[in-house]
Amino acid sequence: KTQADSFSWDGKAWHVKCSKMIEKGGNLIPSEDIITYVAEHVVTATGNHVQNTANLLNTKIAAIPVEHQYIVTEEDPKLIEYRQNNDEHPVLRDADAKWYVREERGGWILGPYEKNAPARFEYKVPENFRADLFPLDLDRIEQEYLSFIKRIPSTETLGIKDDFNGPICYTPDGN
């Protein structure tokens, strides 16, 4: 495991200086062991911090954090019955209705792919932002929720156990 500390472009290749990570007290921290990678292409996986990464690279990246709401249902007796003879239920994606659903502790997680979800952190994630959540706006995902109930009828009478609204990184067109 490594952490990228700095990078530079010499006109032909990237030079990426990294620290090897070590575990200390249950956390990964950088060690004194430094490695430099030389590469023609660098792929970043910085998610919501993509604009911070773009600034470091002195470039623009067409991705931005947007609000992503999802709900967790109470246990579904039909799903629990299914699990008595089967492995975990496969993830379902309804491309037309724009949502995914997966098993979660005997219930379901419904995550809509919202068109025009509000953008967050257009230029940089605030330094003090960790895993904070945004205010819910469940009206925005009502149609996806109704479609989910139609697709999986056993969910119609289930209560909502949890709901979340946090950032997820997408391209500006929401795809």
Protein language model features and the residues they cover:
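Glycine-centered loop/turn positions within well-structured domains
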Residues: 5, 14, 50-51, 69, ...
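A generic structural signal for beta-strand entry/edge sites
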Residues: 11-15, 34, 107
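Glycine-rich beta-alpha-beta "Rossmann" dinucleotide-binding loop(s) and their flanking helix/strand
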Residues: 52-70
